[in-house]
Each structure stands twice: as structure tokens, then as C-alpha cells.
Amino acid sequence: MNWTLELVILPVSDVDRARDFYSKIGFDLDHDHVVSDEIRFVQMTPPGSACSIAFGKGLSESEPGSVKGLQVVVTDIDEAREQLLAAGVDPGEVDEQAWGHFVYFDDPDGNHWAVQYMPYRQN
């Protein structure tokens, strides 16, 4: 039996701003549903990923921006960096380590992401 990771909740302070940010960097919008006056559920998925992020109103008691250590894997770190730059997000220079090449960025609330290319994997 497989146990696949489906969803990671991100605490954000402004749902529309987060939705716009993640759309701008290429995430696909899966759902944006207002359940009630207290609950709004937005689900977005990075291109090619089986796991999504969700944020909204009434979904998390965590402090906005408190999620650290989120990571996505890409097949071309330079292309990913250029895509982020084109979206107005500065991921810094590529950090080349023996176990992978990385760029990093924060969403508008400070939730921290790593983008990794693993050169030892076949693409």
C-alpha cells in the first residue's frame, strides 16, 4: 500500500495575495471555495507535482509565514531560477552542493521554500 503526501497547509495572512503570488510563480489553481463566513479553502499545485498546498481562512492556527523547509524538485535549476526572477521573486544565486543545486525563496508571508535540482538523478 502506498502512502502519498497529498496536501500541505500554509498559514497566510492575505489569501488573495497568496493566491496571486503562487499563480505568478506557476502553481496551478485547483480549488478556491468559500465554505462559510469562517472558512475559505484554496488549493494550488506546483507543476508536475502530486502534492498540493492549501491556504485560506480558517484552515490553520499557525502564525502566517511560520512554515519552513518546504521543498520542490526541478529538472533544471537555472530555468527555475529564471522563472522565479521573471515573476519578480529573487531566489538569489544557485547554491551548488554535492547533494544538489538549490535556490531559495519566501512567499509574501515568509513561508520558506527550497527549489532543488538533483544532478545525480536521471531527468
Residue map of PLM features:
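Short, charged/polar, Gly/Pro-enriched secondary-structure boundary elements
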Residues: 49-53, 110-113
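Short, solvent-exposed beta-strand edge segments and adjacent coil->beta transition regions
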Residues: 3-7, 65-69
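Vicinal oxygen chelate
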Residues: 7, 32-33, 40-43, 81-123
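Short, charged/polar surface micro-motifs in flexible loops or helix N-caps
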Residues: 47-51, 61-62, 76-79
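Core segments of cupin and vicinal oxygen chelate
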Residues: 2-3, 9-51
